[in-house]
């Protein structure tokens, strides 16, 4: 990432530019990923692009991007107050996550927090 890229990303108003940068430079972002996530967390007030970035990185390589995905999920929970986007994260715990709600809620704090927000009486 060069200084021109950083200048461009500093003008990101909602997270879309940062998300696009991640998607378009996926093969070379490892060293800048923390910076990119910090930038996205700063500008994405709704959590929309944070959720998209978490899903994208998970789909590319869940193990390699585990820490980044975890940070993004935590940020999405905080940002998405209207719960418009965080529900899209639940399938990250498997297509059958609904069959394992109790177990996942006990073992994964992010899953528990998302599920509790979406289904406040479900746990």
Spans of model-derived segments:
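Residues at alpha-helix boundaries and short interhelical turns
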Residues: 27, 44, 76-80, 94, ...
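HEAT-repeat alpha-solenoid elements in large eukaryotic scaffold proteins
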Residues: 8-18, 41-51, 73-78
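Short linear sequence motifs
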Residues: 12-14, 86, 104, 108
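Acidic, proline/glycine-rich low-complexity IDRs
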Residues: 98-123
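Context-gated lysine
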Residues: 6-7, 11, 79, 106, ...
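N-terminal low-complexity, intrinsically disordered segments
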Residues: 11-41
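Amphipathic alpha-helical scaffolding segments comprising HEAT/armadillo-like alpha-solenoid repeats
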Residues: 1-6, 28-40, 62-74, 95-105
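Structural detector for internal amphipathic alpha-helices that build alpha-solenoid repeat scaffolds
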Residues: 15-27, 50-62, 81-93, 114-123
């Amino acid at each position: 990432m060069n200084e021109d890229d950083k200048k461009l990303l500093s003008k990101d108003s909602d997270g879309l530019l940062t998300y696009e940068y991640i998607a378009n430079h996926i093969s070379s972002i490892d060293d800048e990923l923390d910076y990119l996530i910090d930038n996205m967390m700063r500008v994405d007030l709704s959590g929309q692009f944070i959720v998209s970035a978490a899903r994208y990185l998970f789909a590319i390589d869940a193990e390699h991007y585990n820490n980044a995905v975890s940070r993004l999920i935590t940020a999405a929970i905080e940002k998405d107050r209207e719960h418009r986007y965080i529900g899209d994260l639940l399938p990250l715990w498997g297509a059958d996550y609904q069959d394992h709600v109790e177990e996942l809620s006990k073992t994964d704090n992010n899953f528990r927090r998302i599920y509790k927000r979406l289904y406040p009486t479900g746990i």
